[in-house]
Amino acid sequence: MTFDPPLVAATLVRRYKRFLFDAVLEDGSDITGFCANTGSMRGLTTPGSRIYLSQSDRPGRKYRYGFELIEADGTLVGVNTSLPNRLAHEAIRAGLVSDLLHYPQIRTEQRYGENSRIDLLLSGSGKADCYVEVKNVHFIRETGLAEFPDSVTTRGAKHLTEMAKLVAAGKRAAMLYVIQRQDCDALAICADLDPVYGRAFTAAISQGVEAYAVKCAITPRGIIPACGVPVRLTV
């Protein structure tokens, strides 16, 4: 995916109230914008960091600028959690997850389970439909190892439980972790920050839920799913 219009560079002042951030544009203008990320963004909110912003003059939009990328640990990291579903779709279509090939139809936001929606539903291959839950990843604390989650995610544990129920009902279910950075070679579950998620992941895998991860190449011009990386299944 490409950013259109192009992103603008700025310096981060602070991120606050979960959805807001203050920054200084390169022309010295002070701005407040919207941060489409409800997570902790652990390690990605350091004041003074170089960031990249989308901009929109769409009528009814409260904030013109949106927080898209930040420079951290010598690499660009995507922070917009509204993008991973689209990136997952692109990754599957590009054949980056070999076990999810040969599904001609990909539908989004399909209802399943107890008042839940699946991010992607793969179908039409003559095989069992595959329910794909997409998660955004951008947390790294050990060189080369991306981790999820970066904070407690009650909804995430619930999703794993419901995915396991799908498998028990004879369906196929997979987690797809989209890593919005390129400086990693594997993904692990961060059970020390969220033990409940760690246990739910272990249980889901033991019951037949599949797990895959894709890392992305990121520039101020766009984000491209680059390749699959292994998921450590032992928590």
Swiss-Prot record:
It comes from Allorhizobium ampelinum (strain ATCC BAA-846 / DSM 112012 / S4). Transmembrane segments: none annotated. Belongs to the SfsA family. It comes from the Bacteria. HAMAP family: SfsA. Pfam families: SfsA, SfsA_N. GO terms for molecular function: DNA binding. Signal peptide: none annotated. This is Sugar fermentation stimulation protein homolog. Disulfide bonds: none annotated.
